[in-house]
Amino acid sequence: MNPSTALARVLVDELARLGLTEAVIAPGSRSTPLALALVADTRIRTHVRIDERSASFLAVGLARASRRPVALVCTSGTAAANFHPAVLEADQSGVSLIVLTADRPPELRGTGANQTVNQIGLYGSAVRFFAEVGVPEREAGMVAYWRSLVCRAWAAAQANKPGPVHLNLAFREPLVPEPGGQPWPEPVTGRPDGKPWITVDLQRNEPEPVELPWVERGVIVCGDGDYDPIPLLALSAQTGWPLLAEPTSNARRAEALSSYRQLLAVPEFVAAHEPELVVSVGRPGLSRQLLAYLRRAPRHVVVGDPVAFADPVRTATDVVGAVTAPPSATPDTAWAASWAAAEAAARAAADRLLDSDETLSELRLARDLAAHLPAGSLLFAGASMPIRDLDAVMRPRCGLRLIGNRGVSGIDGTVSTAVGAALAHQADGGGEAFALLGDLALLHDQNGLLLGPDEPRPNLTIVVVNNDGGGIFSELEQAGHPDFERVFGTPHGVAVEQVAATAGLPYTRVEWATDLPKALIGDGLRLVEVRTDRAASARLRRALQEAVAAAVR
């Protein structure tokens, strides 16, 4: 067995012992030992993608949906650099990736050798752990070094602050197994009981809940994050404090408010609803109005990590690991009744407006899609307007898991992340999967639709809002600039039907709201297009705000 093959086989075996079940491979020559070892191991399901950026976001989707580490493999050079956006998203979102980059041996670095760049510490502070593994040598002691290093990286990816780790692996030729090669000087097998080389206790101690003070005018804010929303919903029920839940908090159920985005944009409402206390969890940031509202609270208790807590507008006064309601709390207050009445009025006004036209607008699509999906479904929300429209009009419901790339909030890798999330969701026994994204996100990651004939395929319906450009900019300050359309609107004229045909995927176009439920029924990977007008959508969002304001004044 040659050294490169030995390192790869030992590394993959140890990862499988630790619990690795998914690996994504971007093809390349220098990474051959890793690729061959992975596809030979029946404990690991492998996915091959020709584009490193697509591969890396596929891994993000797999890891995010499964809540388990996923391995990601590439060759040397720019291949490793193309992983960087996904590594940043994994860092900010707390997604566990095991990034394995193949590299040239030290004697080829800095010499002008082909496909060779400096990969040492390539991802900087975005990784929880980095190791330059070193060139494998045919000597005793290497197996213990390799296996213990893998265990250390695995633990770092899942410790108190989960995230990506990076092992840089220098492989010398030969890169493929050689028949009848020299025997290895020590057994390459791991522990005889099949357990990992090092068993690391990753159990997190549950923090002692801090009892909150009793105030009538409290508010609970649930931002993006993978946490259990049940304690926050219970806190709301015990205190009567309104719960403002972003869609990817998965706390928008029961009595959570779904109209806070519009309510907090009404000056009279905000003036009459000054909070005494805000309790927040996760990473809020979808709504400028919500962030502005946080500044109005004299006390802001953040529930989160004592170091990496979210405080985007620097209003935190306390950071705790968990909270509990004060014994004197009562949910029956004028404060709770006022918020509930405003929510009911806002929701009714929004529904009247959206239901007044059977044409499928962007807002109605977001509302109806979230409502129609069957229990047990996964919904991936694209960045920019799709997630914001869901935030504006998605009604509270149970039985739906909603995720998105909210760490860095880029549109890159959207399709690939959705595919990965769907694959993991269904591998774990979940139901159907759906994605809501814009046309630019689709075009930005068309390679995510290209699955080889032997690749695992998800049941995923991708609903594409096609407004021929970047709709979010129509909501921002630059919308009135004379060069807006070219520089920000970025019309492209690409037909989604052509994109589907290129990838060999089924395609459906939906125009009327009544046709949406039927269009969502189907197996496999498929595209559903809803064509809209950016200017009309911007007007409808303004009309929604005006309708809600009129209803609660």
Curated annotation (Swiss-Prot):
Cofactors that this protein relies on: Mg(2+); Mn(2+); thiamine diphosphate
Cofactor binding annotation: Binds 1 thiamine pyrophosphate per subunit.
Pathway linked to the protein: Quinol/quinone metabolism; 1,4-dihydroxy-2-naphthoate biosynthesis; 1,4-dihydroxy-2-naphthoate from chorismate: step 2/7; Quinol/quinone metabolism; menaquinone biosynthesis
SUPFAM superfamilies per the UniProt record, alphabetical: Thiamin diphosphate-binding fold (THDP-binding)
Known function: Catalyzes the thiamine diphosphate-dependent decarboxylation of 2-oxoglutarate and the subsequent addition of the resulting succinic semialdehyde-thiamine pyrophosphate anion to isochorismate to yield 2-succinyl-5-enolpyruvyl-6-hydroxy-3-cyclohexene-1-carboxylate (SEPHCHC).
Family under the similarity heading: Belongs to the TPP enzyme family. MenD subfamily.
The name this protein goes by in its record: 2-succinyl-5-enolpyruvyl-6-hydroxy-3-cyclohexene-1-carboxylate synthase
Higher taxonomy: Bacteria, Bacillati, Actinomycetota, Actinomycetes, Streptosporangiales
Subunit composition and interactions: Homodimer.
Keyword Transferase: yes
CDD domains per UniProt: TPP_PYR_MenD (cd07037), TPP_SHCHC_synthase (cd02009)
Species in which this protein is naturally found: Thermobifida fusca (strain YX)
